[in-house]
């Protein structure tokens, strides 16, 4: 198959997300994949120019060695709000170019605006379009003024797609509520790779990070969003009544990076709040192994309500108990008694971690977590995705 992916995030700087895991595995199976992306993080580049030229690059793989993917980043005017108008023009030209020259068998979309363009162009060429949903997309638009418009476009995209895939049941219900025909919706979940976890070295990583044998490490990885709940967890660790053996290990970057660094400057906190910048995917198993409890203390806002982050599956595959806030999507996905312990708010995480460490239940809960996700093998999930693409192509 020839597969064209259209998305509105940075394929190179972000992830690995669901798209990286699936597309790199498809490339390793002999399929050809091209990605049209958008540098959503352009504001963070101090050397940015107003006009960013078109780029075409062969990107190094994030998860599967040798699975190189061609990424095309259309030219864009890097000015607030103007970026959207610029995207409409440059992405339309690029999508038409790729449809006419690359001639994909199927197009897979992860965004809003360029998905709308792709759907229209695919329809005129009788090419199937598959929408893959890992978020309530319009919620991610940073300008509240535009979220209503984005929602309308997103709704239209669901109605016109040949197949709508969701990463969990909560998001499938959301897409149906937004106009997707139920018979055209399916759930293809995130996966796990047990081989990825095989050679993790707990003792070595704990020694590198200055973690003692009896320390209890709460682990978070990913983007440090303001609503991630990490600020509240760190504050509770700082409190005098929190046992000194309770430590927070955060791997990633984002809005809370600087506030966490400030908290570390408080007396005695530098070795209890451990922050590590973005790390290569291959190194993450060591950090997972070094931890004792994994956490998802996110606030129950509109962005987080129905999603299940990939990190949840990776936490659980590592055999770690997970403390999570009561996010409806997560609770619907994993239920109770399956390795996830729920708390009402981020402020309850440290107390619950102390409770688990004292009652001796961590190992048992970790075993249940691993058992819960064992069937989510990435190869099996890729089989399902590959078959779904083949079926939608055959129908056309």
Model-inferred region functions:
Residues 198-211:
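A short helix/loop element that forms part of the nucleotide-sugar donor recognition site in Leloir-type
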Residues 293-296, 314-324:
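Short hydrophobic beta-strand element within catalytic cores of glycosyltransferases
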Residues 212-237, 249, 366:
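Conserved donor-binding/catalytic core segment of Leloir-type glycosyltransferases
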Residues 170, 191:
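Carbohydrate-associated surface elements
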Residues 251, 259-285:
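Nucleotide-activated donor-binding/catalytic signature segment of Leloir-type glycosyltransferases, i.e.
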Residues 336-347, 355-360:
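Conserved acidic donor-binding segment of nucleotide-sugar-dependent glycosyltransferases
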Residues 361-375, 387:
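A short, well-ordered alpha-helix in the C-terminal region of glycosyltransferases
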Residues 86-93, 125-130, 138-157:
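Nucleotide-sugar donor phosphate/pyrophosphate-binding loop at the beta->alpha transition
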